Amino acid sequence: MTLKRIFCAALALIVLQSVASAVDYCRLSCPEGRDHVGCRNAGFGAHCGSNPQTPKLHQEHIKMVLQKTNWLRGVVAEGSFCYPKAARMPVLVWDDELANLAALHTKGCVTETNKCRSTERFHSPGQSSYEISGDTLPSAMDILNFALRDWYLQKDNLTREDIGSYPAGEDKGLKNMANLISDKVTAIGCGLAQWRKENYKGAFHCSLLFIERSRSSIYQRGDNFATNCLKTHPTYRAGVLSDEQYSN
C-alpha cells in the first residue's frame, strides 16, 4: 500500500470516528428502553467470526446507489409496473449520519436488528438489509448491485393494493422495495461489512429517513406524476427536490 493510500485510509477513519463521536448516542431516549445501535459500538459483534471489516463506500458507490434508486423511484412515479402514478416523489439524497448508523449496524454482522436507530435529527429511520455468502466475495460494487437488484425484484409481488396500504413496520417480504419507492423517504445512507465464519460473508445495510409515518400508503397517487410538485428535478422528471416543502 502506498503512502498516499495509507494517508487516505487513515483520513477516512478519522472522519468516520469524528461523525460518530460528535453525537453521544447513549444518552438518546429510545423506545421501550432498547439499546441504541451507536451506543458503545466500538468493535464488531459476536456473530462476526474472523477478520471482520467495514470497507469504505467511495463516491462511485454512493453515486451508483443514488442513481439506481432514483431511477427506480422515477419510473414508478410515472406509472411503471402497472403501479399508480405518484403525485410527488422526492429524489433521494445521501446523508452521512444515516450512512454512519448503517455502518455501525453492519458491524453486528446481522441483517436485521431491533436496536434503536433514532438520532437528534431523525426519528426511527427505516432499514433495508442484504446478506451474501460464498467461498469468495465479489467486489463491494457488485455486492451493492446484487442488493439493489434483490430489493428491486420484490416488485414482482408488490401490488397496486400494497401501494395504497402498507403500514410502516409491516414486512411481507416486500419491505425493501416498499422503502425504495416510498414518497415518505427523502434521504439514504448505507454501510457494508465483510467477515469470515465457515465461509465468506458480507452484509449491506441502508438507513432511510422517513419524514412521516402516519399515512399507510407507500406513496400518494395522482392523476399524473408530479402533480403535487412545485418544480420537478432536472434529471428525474417525475421527481422533486427532497427539501421542497409540501403538505400531506
Swiss-Prot record:
Q: Does the keyword Signal apply?
A: yes
Q: Look up the domain of life of the source.
A: Eukaryota
* Cell attachment site (motif): residue ranges: 221-223
MF GO annotations: toxin activity
**The keyword Protein biosynthesis is assigned to this record:** no
Where is the secretion signal located? 1-22
Segments forming domain SCP: 66-208
Q: Let me know which tissues express this protein, per UniProt.
A: Expressed in salivary glands.
Q: Name one GO cellular component term.
A: extracellular region
Tell me which family the UniProt entry assigns to this protein. Belongs to the CRISP family.
The protein, known as:
Tabinhibitin 10
